[in-house]
Amino acid sequence: MHFAREGYLRIFGLGILCLVLNLLGFTKLGFVFLLLTFFIAYFFRDPDRVAPEDDRYLIAPADGRVVTIEQNVSNDRWSTAPATRVGIFMSPLDVHVNRLPASGVVESVRYQEGKFRPAFAEDAAQVNEQNGVTIQDARGRRVVFVQVAGILARRIVCSLKGGERVRQGERYGMIMLGSRVDLYCPVEAQIKIRVGQAVKAGETIIAEYAERTSNASPP
């Protein structure tokens, strides 16, 4: 089992504190911090995932449950072209690491301040704090995915930069304490999931294009 790099210092620090408390005789308090250490380790877990390696597919950028599938979204703040928006709600118990839904070149990374309403609320995608990424694949198709903060999750982590070449299934960030990730699929991609379905980042196929490009590697 791997852990997200953002968690190593926290896990190590709590582990040392737990050890010191036990050595000083504060065993009950040490036990409390031991439980806390296990909780933090679970929170930052980062299991390996096997991507389909087929660029006909757009894969899930987050673990969680599909809460919305909205057809023909256009003139949105993140996507001016018509798209299908798939919203994935991440509970505090889900893996919090986010993965790339497609290969290509990062066109833009945009952060927007906002509120911290519950991520499953209908207006969360419009009013909450969020970070959106646009990728252009080898055939010029644009895919947008947006990390949305929630009532508990108030820290968004994204390591991507404009101009960077990326590969489908790679880790690119996380949202502390879960929340929501929205994936904007081009209208020509056929949606393969349904509302209420559980999905896994880097593995679950969200949508499929009719044709396949040369391979799933960045151009």
PLM segments and residue spans:
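Contiguous, well-folded functional domains in the mature portion of proteins
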Residues: M1-P219
